Amino acid sequence: MSRIGKYPVEVPKGVTVTLNGQDLAVKGPKGELKLTLVDDVTVEQGESGLKVAPREDTQRARAMWGLSRTLVKNIVTGVTDGFTKTLEINGVGYRAAIQGKNLQLNLGFSHDVLYPIPEGIDIKCTKPTEIVITGIDKQKVGQVAAEIRGYRGPEPYKGKGVKYAGEYIFRKEGKKK
């Protein structure tokens, strides 16, 4: 039995859930998200919320059970609260700024890096060295954060680069004479 999948997903007030076969549409105060579930699981709407269950007792169905429940919970949380990722920029002269629909990053290259902000994602630069990414789709928020971090990931000697807030960077000692 799945330790994650056996619990129902609570649906808060103000959120409407539409089930159409394997298609799930969730509408809330922040927007609307759609999800197509795999054929190995079923979703039922009850008093306690959305209940995800495997269709049959196969290994794939059990594997998809917990995953599907988590995906359903993520879209319900996304349309009610949304998701946020914070990036920190460390390094002399490294900074970020919003320019229209682009995020401009100065990361020590000979040129500025322009990152086009995708639809459904909101990016704010609270400080020149801090980027806050918000949105209703958890996967999209994480993907955007990973792409921005990928331009100049933190290096292990001085810690320069773009890192997630709260991320621990394994440090190395420099050369010795």
Curated annotation (Swiss-Prot):
GO cellular component terms, alphabetically, are:
cytosolic large ribosomal subunit
Give one GO molecular function term: rRNA binding
Q: Which family does it belong to?
A: Belongs to the universal ribosomal protein uL6 family.
Domain of life of the source: Bacteria
Has the keyword Ribonucleoprotein been applied to this entry? yes
Quote the subunit structure annotation.
Part of the 50S ribosomal subunit.
The reply to whether Coiled coil figures as a keyword in the UniProt entry is no
Q: What is this protein called?
A: Large ribosomal subunit protein uL6
SUPFAM superfamilies for the chain: Ribosomal protein L6
State the PROSITE patterns in the record: RIBOSOMAL_L6_1 (PS00525)
Q: Where are the transmembrane segments?
A: none
Q: What job does this protein perform?
A: This protein binds to the 23S rRNA, and is important in its secondary structure. It is located near the subunit interface in the base of the L7/L12 stalk, and near the tRNA binding site of the peptidyltransferase center.
Q: Which organism is it from?
A: Parvibaculum lavamentivorans (strain DS-1 / DSM 13023 / NCIMB 13966)
The processes (GO biological process) annotated in the record are: cytoplasmic translation
What keywords tag this UniProt record? Ribonucleoprotein, Ribosomal protein, RNA-binding, rRNA-binding
